[in-house]
Amino acid sequence: MLILRGLSNIIILGNEQMDKSFKNFAMMTGATLIMAVGTYFFKFTNNFTFSGITGLAVLVAKTGLISAADFSFITNMLLLVLGAVILGKQFVAKTAYCSILLSVTLSLLERVYPMSHPFTDEPMLEVMFAIALPAFGSAILFNIGASSGGTDIIAMIVKKYSSINIGKALIVSDIAITVLGFFVFGMKTGLYSLFGLSIRSFLVDNFIESLNLSKYFNVVCAKPDPICDFIVNQLHRGATICDARGAFSGSEKYIILTALNRQQAIKLRNFIKKEDPSAFILISNTSEIIGKGFHAI
């Protein structure tokens, strides 16, 4: 009986792991395709030079020797090989997959849907999509421990062999590439590229925060059991109960502490409204919860 129960637990854990792996694979694929669309249709066609390898690709494409998509493909493949040789086991498979998918998609788009002009004659609209789509895709990848390669691989290599501040080094390289855009494509395009560079990191951070947004509940009530039962049995979350006393009434109270995602938060709020209308609820937004059911330490 114990053996059967153990096998059952192993099967359940295996299925959960497969579901998580498939979900991560789907998210990596979707996020990388979003980045490719934003880069090809809005960044390459407008000659925006912000952001790493693709920004450098726009500059190189101006020479006419190679297209931006092909340069990105070749450079990313070389960086992948270099990363595999130097980093070995530290080289993450997720990064390799996303980098290859991004490079291949850009090359395919160039051949299937060649573009010589932007979609619109509104540069501000174009630059917003050129920033927002790749930033959103990057946020999804960073959130699941992946990246699209490029300068991230260079950063991993440099980090292994030196104590250089990688963040500052990447910012300096991005600024240098963006500034070159002023001389190659003119003041107008250069300013749009500088604008894109200045808000890209801000957008990535905000997208990540939005993806991780959860709700932290402090519920002050006289009867905690029904609420805790709902949290544990219906929402499948944990909760902590603390003894308290009302400062004005002097009556005994209980404080229930719990953290939920946004959908669960709505359900709990509606349940408390129906079950205990006199309860006092404090709800706070939090973008980082570490522990079982959320993010691992």
What do these predicted regions represent?
Residues 1-17:
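Short, Lys/Arg-enriched N-terminal segments with co-localized hydrophobic residues
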Residues 7-10, 63, 136, 170-173, ...:
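Positively charged, small/polar-rich N-terminal and surface patches that mediate targeting and assembly
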Residues 14-223:
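Core subunits and conserved enzymes of cellular information-processing
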